[in-house]
């Protein structure tokens, strides 16, 4: 806009997209609301973050409250390890919640026809201008679409009336309505209201989708601050910069007193308006008072709707006040900066000066906090992914064919698992591991043996067999006392001690503890009865030619551990002639020796040999 076209009744404001630099727009809005509120009656355009400020100006939202909201969002972004890139930080979600709170119920009616928002259609990247809204939700959706930066704010673009849109700055970052549009940008360039950057003499610049940006050092800093928020002090200076730049523009257009006039400290005592003016500028709560006070300070000032050519300078103005820009370094802008705008920054600085923030100021604590944040970043990513999936499932109802596919897949996996289970036998193999010393000798513990002996649980058949064995031992002791059994008795073909030891239940337990089992197999038969199968070693070949040789095997086979003896199952029909040694089967802690056909019972066992032998002579646990 040129000075020739600076007619206030025709001026339209246009706020460019700038990310977290929208605090600069807040300073510009504060100056306009205080010194030129008539500019808010026309159209206001905005892209990205500029659309939020434009909506606040039209709906009459308190600028101080809006600034507090901006600082709140910045504080939450800076508290994360990776700032706004942290997966738990939802920028658009926070902005949406705040807009739903601060906007009045009829905001969409106030913005219809006056608020112009620049959008970029996701399908073809064409610019779309929106100025009609059906509800507050419709208005907020348009603002969210204009603020969405791909990958920075998310992956899926938001929708406005069923169509996906992204940041309006991608196609038009500085929307222009007509030649009377006043452009506002936080970047130094050719915009009407922008930082002048007096200390830079760069004449080079770039046009970013309608926004003029000069190649200056400060602009590089501002570009980084767009997406990565700065400290509270930096944001305070940016807001003050916007207030001063807007006030300078209004002064050039004759819509506000000269900056130098506002800083005059001595006013004629005969002019009562001077005292009222200083009081009003210190309070700054009523924009109408400020406008009313500024008129008496002028010798002959036209109204705000008059042309700039009819404007007369104030009594204390010099010849160059209205024709040239005055550097901000030469005036004290902060002296007449509204106090209501200072309060949000003072509160934010006070919060940063707490004891916790003081502890966080130490370098070691900052490094430790950063390291912890980086270490738990993968867990935060996983949690954010789960939340996104949950939100997607809540919003999108999967079709029936997808549910059937997943159900079929689950049934297939479960069926394969059951098939794999059936291929394996459910058994447990126990291998005895004996403790030895440095010389290889087995270490025996009488205490542990007694405890293990107590822990043996016998089945009903084993208990009956144990009673039978004890009854036989009792009979042998009675015969021994009566003198009917002697070592020289011709009827006794066995050594009395060896027969007693081999056939006794205690000897069976001692034998199993002193000899390591090569293999012990526990299984259940078709009747779900637990059975035991064991293999032991034998040192000598034991032929089945005579009963005396078999008896000799009973005496000496228990001490050797050099030869493996195969033990057939109970249902195996293995011929005895094919086996070179008697099978030794251990069931429930007992040893049973299979005799050959030529073997005969000597009658000294105490058991009736004429009694029919049961089919399963083994003892089971």
UniProtKB/Swiss-Prot annotation:
- Pathway membership of this protein? Glycerolipid metabolism; triacylglycerol degradation
UniProt-annotated stretches for the region Disordered: 541-562, 595-621
Where, in residue ranges, is this chain on the Lumenal side?
Answer: 65-621
InterPro entries assigned to the protein according to its UniProt record, in alphabetical order: Acyl_Trfase/lysoPLipase, PLPL, PNPLA_dom
Instruction: Tell me, in one coarse class, where this protein mainly resides.
Output: other
Q: How does it sit in the membrane?
A: Single-pass type II membrane protein
Q: Phenotype of the disruptant?
A: RNAi-mediated knockdown reduces stored lipid droplet hydrolysis during fasting resulting in retained/increased lipid droplets and there are also increased lipid droplets in the fed state. Suppresses fasting-induced oxygen consumption. RNAi-mediated knockdown abrogates the increased fat loss and increased oxygen consumption rate observed in the hlh-11 ok2944 mutant. RNAi-mediated knockdown also abrogates the increased fat loss observed following overexpression of flp-7.
Q: For this UniProt record, give its keywords in alphabetical order, as a comma-separated list.
A: Cell membrane, Cytoplasm, Hydrolase, Lipid degradation, Lipid droplet, Lipid metabolism, Membrane, Phosphoprotein, Signal-anchor, Transmembrane, Transmembrane helix, Ubl conjugation
Q: Which residues form the PNPLA domain?
A: 13-180
Changes after translation: Phosphorylation at Ser-303 by aak-2 results in possible instability and cytoplasmic accumulation during the dauer phase.
A biological process from GO? lipid homeostasis
Q: Where in the cell is it found?
A: Lipid droplet; Cell membrane; Cytoplasm
Chain span(s) of sequence motif DGA/G: 167-169
Name the Pfam families for this protein. Answer: Patatin (PF01734)
Protein name per UniProt? Patatin-like phospholipase domain-containing protein atgl-1
Question: What is the gene name?
Answer: atgl-1
């Amino acid at each position: 806009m040129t000075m020739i076209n600076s007619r206030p009744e025709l001026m339209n404001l246009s706020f460019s997209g700038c990310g977290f630099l929208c605090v600069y727009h807040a300073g510009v809005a504060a100056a306009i609301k205080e010194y030129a509120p008539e500019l808010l009656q026309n159209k206001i355009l905005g892209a990205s973050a500029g659309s939020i400020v434009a909506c606040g100006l039209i709906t009459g939202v308190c600028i101080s409250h809006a600034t507090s909201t901006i600082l709140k969002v910045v504080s939450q972004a800076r508290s994360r390890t990776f700032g706004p890139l942290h997966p738990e930080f939802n920028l658009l979600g926070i902005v949406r919640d705040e807009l739903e709170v601060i906007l009045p119920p009829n905001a969409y009616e106030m913005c219809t026809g006056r608020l112009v928002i620049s959008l970029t259609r996701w399908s073809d990247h064409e610019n779309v201008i929106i100025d009609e809204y059906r509800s507050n939700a419709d208005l907020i959706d348009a603002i969210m679409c204009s603020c969405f930066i791909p990958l920075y704010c998310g992956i899926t673009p938001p929708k406005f009336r069923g169509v996906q849109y992204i940041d309006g700055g991608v196609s038009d970052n500085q929307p222009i309505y007509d030649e009377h549009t006043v452009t506002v940008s936080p970047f130094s360039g050719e915009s009407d209201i922008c930082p002048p950057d007096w200390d830079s003499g760069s004449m080079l610049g770039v046009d970013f989708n309608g926004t003029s940006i000069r190649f200056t050092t400060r602009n590089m800093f501002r570009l980084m601050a767009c997406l990565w928020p700065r400290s509270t002090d930096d944001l305070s200076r940016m807001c003050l910069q916007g207030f001063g730049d807007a006030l300078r523009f209004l002064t050039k257009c004759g819509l506000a007193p000269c900056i130098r006039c506002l800083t005059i400290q001595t006013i004629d005592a005969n002019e009562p308006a001077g005292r009222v003016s200083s009081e009003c500028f210190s309070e700054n709560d009523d924009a109408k008072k400020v406008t009313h006070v500024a008129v008496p300070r002028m010798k002959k000032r036209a109204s705000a709707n008059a042309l700039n050519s009819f404007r007369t300078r104030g009594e204390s103005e010099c010849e160059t006040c209205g024709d040239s820009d005055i550097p901000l370094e030469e005036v004290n802008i902060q002296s007449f900066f509204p106090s209501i705008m200072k309060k949000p920054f003072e509160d934010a600085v006070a919060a940063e000066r707490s004891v916790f923030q003081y502890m966080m100021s130490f370098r070691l604590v900052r490094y430790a906090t950063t390291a912890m944040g980086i270490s738990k970043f993968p867990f935060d990513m996983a949690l954010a992914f789960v939340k996104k999936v949950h939100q997607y499932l809540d919003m999108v109802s999967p079709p029936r064919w997808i549910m059937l596919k997943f159900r079929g897949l689950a049934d297939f996996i479960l069926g394969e698992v059951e098939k794999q289970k059936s291929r394996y036998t459910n058994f447990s193999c126990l291998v005895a591991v004996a403790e030895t010393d440095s010389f290889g000798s087995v270490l025996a513990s009488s205490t542990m043996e007694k405890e293990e002996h107590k822990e043996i649980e016998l089945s009903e058949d084993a208990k009956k067999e144990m009673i039978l064995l004890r009854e036989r031992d009792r009979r042998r002791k009675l015969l021994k006392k009566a003198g009917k059994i002697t070592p020289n008795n011709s009827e006794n073909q066995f050594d009395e001690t060896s027969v007693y030891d081999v056939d006794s239940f205690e000897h069976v337990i001692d034998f199993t503890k002193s000899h390591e089992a090569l293999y012990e197999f526990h299984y259940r038969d078709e009747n779900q009865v637990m059975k035991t199968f064991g293999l032991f070693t034998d040192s000598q070949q034991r032929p089945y030619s005579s009963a005396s040789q078999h008896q000799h095997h009973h005496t000496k086979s228990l001490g050797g551990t050099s030869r493996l003896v195969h033990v057939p199952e109970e249902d195996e029909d293995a011929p005895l002639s094919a086996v070179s040694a008697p099978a030794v089967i251990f069931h429930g802690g007992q040893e049973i020796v299979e005799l050959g056909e030529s073997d005969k019972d000597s009658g000294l066992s105490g058991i009736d040999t004429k009694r029919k032998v049961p089919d399963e002579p083994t003892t089971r646990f």
